[in-house]
């Protein structure tokens, strides 16, 4: 399994299917629109004879990819490189069947055409293996890129969150580690690593050194995932709090139990609840315990720099997913993406089989520029954004609906796949129709239920009252803890004079 949360205010959670295709000899494809400044492609590369079918970020062979950007050192960027990480991920899915093939596609193209983007961590999974590949550019005018790829051991969980995570790595174990020839020498040439200093070479130290901000907003997320997957390790918060001498977190750990898709959904839903960094606590959470902090993440006050906590669950998520790639099932059934739009905390993860041949309207219509009740992305945004106004009261109702839907879908999964397997034995087209109808219908049904939930919440929580559905409106006011803060800050502002005996009735 791999996961992804695409967190950016300009990301719309629409899906597309790219059909498999055969291509003519000599066919070229345009590449290299990496930034808004790239009005035209930076270059062209040859097309291959055949490209595989791709649904979102999973292809017909159950190969799945995801990413997080860590940027790295600006000096490593190469504006002459023509390939960016987004294009390279697409090309991996179109041209590779396994994770190792995907790494060869990625690094081969980088070697030939140059990497022109910022530092990236990329998760790659097939039915047998999971890898993390990290890459930076080779500097202005440089060739290729600088990269390392590490296989995550079976039975372990790894996490990366906008910060390079690969430290030391084995140089003579190609079954578990691959790297570019310049992975160390480039850092030495730039003065970012001194082999005579007596310290081992660590990729993240050379190419994306930790800063107080990175530790706070990136490594806290890593710590939170690993500590919840393996609480027995009792991982310390010292590193992400920037305490001297604290060591970085391991790239991967053995979880205390085997993780199910539902367990992984839970790992993606986090505001550090129950820790010293719980975002539902404190004056910054407001009267109703909201864990959401509007950007920017950092600010200065009286010359001192501060930073909000940055959790996995955040308001600007465009979409997220959890994939399953299973060798014991035929590809159309074994490849499954549990897909959700908007904030991970309030989304519903819905099953999309890689064998489906049509998309639900709710995930393939609309845009960022115009609201639509037909779009799942907009409907889920309505619910999440409105629930922010009285988080402690509304979000439990949202999560009750979420649990109801996801529990039902997880319970149905074995029977659905058993039926699909039986159909595959006699009629592959009927199997495809069955999986498509199942996935599409549940997306549309859930979107309709979420529209109803939006209407219900807006009716019940209105104008500061809570409506009980029987023409009665309850005054709920503010929590006592919040009222005490108000009085502490302005003790005389709201105090009423004591009643005089003559005024008492």
PLM feature spans:
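A contiguous strand-loop segment
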Residues: 1-85, 105-259
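Soluble extracytoplasmic regions of secretory-pathway and membrane proteins
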Residues: 3-8, 133-135, 271, 278-294, ...
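Short, well-ordered beta-strand elements within core beta-sheets of diverse protein domains
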Residues: 89-95
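Short, charged, surface-exposed loops that flank catalytic or proteolytic processing sites
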Residues: 95-101
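Glycine-rich, aromatic-lined ligand/substrate-binding cores of catalytic
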Residues: 185-336, 340
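Substrate-recognition/cap regions that form aromatic- and gly/pro-loop-enriched pockets
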Residues: 286-423
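Histidine-centered catalytic/metal-binding microenvironments
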Residues: 406-505
């Amino acid at each position: 399994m791999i996961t992804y949360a695409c967190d950016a205010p300009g990301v719309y959670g629409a899906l597309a299917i790219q059909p498999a295709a055969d291509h003519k000899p000599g066919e070229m494809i345009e590449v290299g629109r990496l930034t808004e400044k790239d009005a035209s492609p930076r270059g062209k590369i040859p097309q291959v004879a055949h490209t595989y079918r791709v649904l979102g970020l999973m292809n017909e062979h159950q190969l799945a990819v995801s990413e997080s950007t860590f940027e790295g050192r600006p000096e490593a960027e190469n504006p002459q490189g023509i390939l960016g990480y987004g294009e390279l991920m697409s090309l991996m899915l179109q041209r590779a069947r396994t994770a190792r093939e995907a790494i060869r596609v990625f690094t081969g193209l980088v070697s030939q055409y140059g990497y022109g983007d910022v530092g990236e961590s990329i998760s790659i999974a097939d039915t047998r293996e999971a890898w993390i590949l990290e890459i930076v550019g080779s500097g202005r005018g440089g060739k290729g890129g600088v990269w390392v790829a590490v296989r995550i051991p079976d039975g372990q969980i790894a996490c990366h969150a906008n910060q390079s995570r690969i430290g030391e790595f084995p140089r003579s174990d190609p079954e578990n580690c691959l790297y570019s020839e310049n992975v160390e020498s480039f850092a030495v040439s730039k003065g970012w690593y001194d082999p005579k200093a007596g310290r081992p070479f660590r990729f993240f130290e050379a190419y994306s050194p930790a800063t107080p901000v990175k530790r706070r907003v990136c490594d806290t997320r890593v710590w939170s995932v690993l500590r919840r997957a393996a609480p027995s390790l009792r991982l310390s918060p010292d590193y992400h709090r920037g305490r001297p001498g604290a060591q970085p977190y391991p790239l991967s750990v053995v979880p205390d139990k085997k993780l199910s898709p539902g367990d992984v959904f839970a790992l993606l839903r986090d505001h550090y609840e129950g820790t010293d960094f719980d975002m539902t606590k404190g004056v910054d959470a407001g009267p109703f315990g909201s864990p959401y902090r509007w950007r920017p993440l950092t600010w200065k006050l009286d010359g001192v720099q501060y930073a909000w906590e940055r959790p996995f669950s955040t308001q600007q998520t465009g979409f997220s997913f959890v994939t399953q790639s299973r060798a014991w099932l035929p590809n159309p059934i074994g490849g499954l993406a549990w897909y959700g739009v908007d904030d991970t905390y309030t989304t519903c993860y819905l099953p999309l089989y890689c064998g489906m041949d049509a998309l639900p309207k709710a995930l393939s219509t609309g845009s960022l520029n115009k609201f639509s009740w037909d779009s799942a992305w907009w409907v889920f945004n309505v619910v999440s954004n409105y629930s922010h106004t009285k988080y402690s009261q509304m979000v439990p109702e949202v999560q009750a609906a979420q649990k109801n839907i996801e529990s039902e879908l997880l319970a149905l999964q074995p029977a659905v796949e058993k039926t699909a397997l039986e159909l595959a034995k006699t009629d592959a087209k009927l199997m495809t129709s069955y999986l498509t109808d199942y996935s599409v219908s549940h997306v549309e049904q859930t979107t309709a239920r979420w529209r109803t939930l939006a209407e219900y919440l807006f009716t019940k929580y209105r104008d500061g009252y809570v409506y009980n559905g029987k023409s009665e409106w309850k005054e709920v006011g503010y929590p006592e803890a919040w009222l005490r803060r108000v009085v502490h800050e302005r003790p005389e502002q709201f105090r009423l004079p004591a009643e005089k005996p003559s005024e008492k009735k």
